[in-house]
Amino acid sequence: MCIRDNAEDLPKKLPNIEDKVVISIDDWQSRRSCPKGKIIKVLGAPDSPGVDILQIIYAHKLPLRFKNKVIKEAEEFSSDIPEEEILSREDWRDRPVFTIDPADARDFDDAILVEKCDDGSWELAVHIADVSYYVKPGTELDKEAFIRGNSTYLVDRVIPMLPEVLSNGLCSLVPGKDRLTHAAIMKFNSKGSVISVRFCKAVIRNAHRFTYEEAYSLLKKPDPKNAFSERLTTAWELAKTLRSRRFKSGALELDMPEIKVILEESGKPTNLVRSENDISHQLIEEFMLAANEAVAKHIKNKMRPSLFRVHESPDADKLFDFRQLVLSYGLEIGDPSAPNELQKLLKSIQGRMEEHVIKVGLLRSMKRASYSADPLGHYGLSKTNYTHFTSPIRRYADLIVHRVLAAVTGSVPSSTPKFDELQQTANHISSTERTSSSAEMESQKLKLIEFLWNEKKVCQDGSPASHPAIIHEVRRKGLFIELTDLLIKGLVPERALPHCREGYW
């Protein structure tokens, strides 16, 4: 590249030739010509702390800071809720609502309460942070939230959709503080079928904050001395019933483990923690799914334009490729377009060595979920009506849905966006979601590779580090494998494999 810059000034901007820089390309007439541009920012040396992640942030054009006018608007809110606002809402502050979140979370979107009734039915209250009280349409906060579309969770930081004074402060359902919520109150019979649903604006005071690890521990070993242990057990009874009912209706069980990279302050990866979708995660998952579906049904029944979370059925050619993969393992499958056939397959491979490969193959055959103003349904969840309502602190889609729900329930004036405007919003936030997902995966991959590289340097005594692996694909150029303990995928080139004889490994 030809850098257009003042020759005398260049050493000041680029003190080291290996520095990572951000450039803008001013002219690139053809691929045969050298592009011309200018340096707009020097990130620093490649091995400087944080430069690797900054490179990803700039490459994906993610915003690093909020504009001053956005921060100013956020800081104008009082930490005290006006008394007239509290009086206009249902008061749940004396009810034992609680939260379950990751240990390092600070933006608590949701709180729950489950009560078992004498007739064997359950009442589930899902309280969601009422971000729409603070972020009004057309404000600077709203414009910025729309541009960002969602929060981005990189391996070493969060790039929030809203300023921290809201995302981690006034909107976050932290313990012991009065917080405004938009609630879905659902009643289920003993078999998990919905009896009734109502929605309300409320004020709560989070009575207890669980981490997922704490909740899991109490669910596996209840503690009579813990006042919330029994409530947690009751909640899991309902969640387990809803989960069973969901899979019977055709939902696909595609839960996959995840890896969390633990970093030093310098950004160096020191440990990897494997996270499974255990019963504490499943409990919250089922309640959020129930609330999202209830909201989608209500809005659709009121025939009000809104945003929906949609997941279309896979293309036939993708399913054909998946079927070939299944058959190559000697497994049986009927019509792969039939959810019951996929369920039967997934159940038959539980605990088997090929389970992970088959699940990955099935996920690859699926279309990507997105947002739409058309209620097209959700294939993977087997739901005709579905939306996103439960995370308005970190997703703009949920904020829009909160506004629409408030309009149809009479909580606020009834003006809401038209269909065409909503579809444009859906296209935009689907795009920002893809961008964030790409950046998140890239930052994770970067630190996983760094972890392996450091592991290799530690093993210079000649005893190489070893990891269990599975082969996903056999290609002409080598083997596409996955380290199952680290969930890292990559190609082992043919030249690196031991050869039995020419053309064979």
Residue ranges with predicted function:
Residues 1-125, 132-177, 447, 496-499, ...:
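Charge-lined substrate channels and their catalytic hotspots, especially those that engage the 3′ end
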Residues 32-34, 47-51, 108-110, 134-137, ...:
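Short helix/loop capping segments that flank catalytic or ligand/cofactor-binding pockets
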Residues 151-248:
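Conserved catalytic alpha/beta cores of large enzymes that bind or transform nucleotide phosphates
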Residues 164-167, 220-225, 269-281, 303-309, ...:
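Glycine- and acidic
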Residues 189, 227, 233-241, 277-297, ...:
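Conserved pre-motif C helix in the palm subdomain of viral-like polymerases
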Residues 246-270, 286-296, 313-314, 320, ...:
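Core structural elements
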Residues 294, 312, 317-320, 326-505:
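Structured C-terminal cores of nucleic-acid metabolism proteins
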